[in-house]
A protein has these predicted regions:
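Double-stranded beta-helix
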Residues: 139-208
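Short, conserved beta-strand element in jelly-roll/cupin
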Residues: 118-138, 195-198, 227-230
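A short secondary-structure junction signal
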Residues: 104-108, 117-119, 139-145, 154-158, ...
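Non-heme Fe(II)/2-oxoglutarate
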Residues: 41-46, 52, 198-203, 207-270
Length: 270
């Protein structure tokens, strides 16, 4: 996947890009089945909600051949090389479950705030790519963004260790209110929540302010996140476990574009 000048301009202005149906139904079925298998594991990389439901599976690409293919997929890697102008490595890989009825909130935050404070990442030359494994609906905990908020740099944040089972550097209500007011568009809205079918992809800037509400519906909302960082911008502090913030800065070598599809068809033929 190659980004056009118009897409790059939109990313620089809005802070994110949305690509509906980036992966096929066959590819996503393979990934979804693998996600269900991984979320059933009892491993240290599986972070759980306070209820015990799976919240996040970290580093799945290190113990799943299927997710190892996704972590090297050219549809995700090539646009990042294009934006950063250099090779990238996997800083973090996570599967967020947002389980039906039990998926908890992710508070308003900037990802680069964590990467800088906890991991010593020098600059926001890293970003997230979100791959929808389930349909993301307006009511099952969609990602919410404040457009253009990446332009304000890294904002002051507090370390919230109590709201959910996962500690997070979060923004206060006054900051979020101000950013939303300044982002209001022609429709009078300062927040967007992209929705779409499984296989859709969002790429967003490391400083873009975002959150997601709890999922109180019967509809699960699994999303895989790749955090890709420019190799020259690798982290310098190792306060978090290696399976949360990776220390292998080797440039990603992409697989063939049809690698996931071939794996899915091979599995179906078994």
């Amino acid at each position: 996947m190659h980004l056009s000048p118009e897409q790059i301009g939109k990313f620089e202005e809005q802070g994110f890009l949305f690509f509906p149906n980036c992966f096929s139904e066959e590819e996503i079925a393979l990934l979804r089945d693998e996600a269900e298998r991984i979320l059933s594991f009892d491993r240290q990389e599986i972070w759980r909600e306070k209820t015990g439901a799976p919240r996040t599976a970290f580093a799945a690409h290190t113990f799943s051949d299927v997710f190892a293919l996704l972590a090297r997929h050219p549809r995700l890697i090539k646009p990042m090389r294009q934006i950063f102008g250099e090779d990238v490595y996997v800083h973090q890989f996570k599967l967020n479950a947002k389980a039906a009825f039990e998926g908890d909130v992710w508070q308003w935050h900037q990802d680069y705030g964590t990467w800088a404070r906890d991991d010593g990442m020098p600059q926001p030359r890293a970003m997230n790519i979100a791959v929808f494994l389930d349909e993301v609906l307006p009511f099952n905990g969609p990602l919410m963004f404040i457009p253009k908020s990446h332009k304000y740099g890294t904002l002051a944040a507090g370390h919230d260790t109590s709201t959910t089972s996962y500690p997070l550097w979060t923004l206060d209500n006054a900051t979020v209110t101000r950013l939303v007011a300044e982002a209001v568009d022609a429709a009078g809205l300062g927040i967007v929540a992209p929705t779409g079918k499984p296989g859709s992809v969002i790429m967003f800037h490391g400083n873009l302010v975002h959150a997601s509400p709890p999922n109180i519906t019967p509809y699960p909302r699994k999303i895989v996140y790749l955090t890709l960082c420019a190799v020259s911008n690798h982290i310098t502090r190792f306060s978090r476990p290696e399976w949360v913030a990776h220390r292998d800065f080797t440039p990603i070598q992409t697989v063939d574009d049809d690698a996931l599809l071939a794996r899915a068809r091979a599995a179906a033929a078994e």
